[in-house]
Amino acid sequence: MITASDSTSWLHCHGRIWLDKFQPAGEAVEPSEFDKLIIRMGEGHEWNIKRELARQYQLVEAVSEDHTRALMEAGAQIIYQGQLSEGDIIGKPDFLIRLESGQYQAADAKLARSEEKKEIQIQLGIYRKLLGNGLNALVFLGTGDVTEIGEEADKDVEKFLQSMREILAMKAMPQVRYSESKCRACTYFNICKPQFEAKGELTLLYGIDSRAALGLEKQGIDTIRKLADANPAQIEDVPYLKGYEKRYRAVLQAKSYFDDSIHQLKPITLPNGTWIHFDVEANPLSDNGEDHVYLWGLLKPPYNGQAFEYIWTDSEKQDREGWEAFLAKIAEYRAQYTDLVLAHFSGYEVQKIKAYADRYQMHEHPTVAWLLGDNTPLFDLLEPIKECIVLPVASYGLKYICKHPKLVNFQWDDSDSGSQWSVVQYVNYLGELRPDDRERLKRNILTYNFDDVMGTRKLEEWVRTREVVDHPA
């Protein structure tokens, strides 16, 4: 059977939805702590919507499809957890709302900030199909807005249903590609990853996506081993691997997969000056729907525990207060270090500074203008690494590079910590009433953020052991 909620796994990966339907015997699949948090928050949002509707209307919970039909025939104002089906399709809308015409309108409570997410479009589109009355479906968003989904979702619904029927008819899992970011977070990672490794799947390599892999396979290069042995000058251009330099990097990436080799393509240019390492932690699940940066972490000389400084906010109510405290701290550093380099890893920190400048209309603020101007002290350490070095990692993320024993070999205090982990810790912190446990959660997050900025510092030190060219800050 095909359920409306299958759309999430289907959009993520066709292999994942096949495994959802034909789960291997003996394989225990446990959602991550972050997924559990999302489920818990989603259930809380649904309960709040249910409570508000129950205050205004007669609300009855359905226990089966027959019961749902009976409630509809009886004219119940709102049916909670109704069950609908047609052929091989099953739908369980959170709410069926009776209109004055006597027709029922499907509605779901979604923690999302927008109804544009494809899985929501498909799921609500299926409810519309099952009801068959042409009414738009409602979405009670996490932002408090109520939006509608209509016939614009019909094409995606039909595409989903056709694909699902093809997948369910397969005797074995469909052939899919590997994606480090998507697969690493999947509950079936430990099932699928060994299969990708056994076949030498090209997309295990950083920089090789499904389109590039297909182009290489058409040339007979269908494994990592074959790519490592290939002559880049003899490889034809393929999507996203156009030009000799990109093909050469792909071959080197394949070689490093087997022998952990490091290949420096050209000298790395780093700015001179006093480096202060910078990292932020944000909560994307805030009540107002905007990312709340609750921790601005900074590591200044002499780069030890005592040199770790931070701005912390206890809730999104202190959002502006935390932002302005961060700007004040940067102004303090600017006065103290005339050659300041504010080093970070990847573009995330700059994105957040821009977002906060927009949020509070502070682009003219002198510190903001400096941070976002032509003479910015901000320096993304990832950029010269990606440009100048090929590393034996599946992803050029900070932890991949730092934790590798043949690279930086810096380890985080909590090996399970990460960006999603920190969100879980902070949301738990917000809901924790016991002072000791609340302080423990805060301390765990601060330790993680300290490790992030220290990891960036250790990465800088490691990069400086390579061939480096300094330039003025």
Regions found by a protein language model. Give the residues of each.
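Conserved DEDDh/DEDDy metal-dependent 3′-5′ exonuclease domain
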Residues: 64-71, 75-82, 86, 90-97, ...
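C-terminal extensions
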Residues: 192-302, 308-312, 318-319
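Metal-dependent nuclease catalytic cores that hydrolyze phosphodiester bonds in DNA/RNA
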Residues: 1-101
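Active-site-adjacent bridging/hinge elements
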Residues: 96-106, 297-300, 304, 422-436
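Generic beta-strand/beta-sheet core signal
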Residues: 107, 230, 278, 299-301, ...
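Short, amphipathic alpha-helical segments that act as regulatory/interfacial helices
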Residues: 46, 50, 54, 128, ...
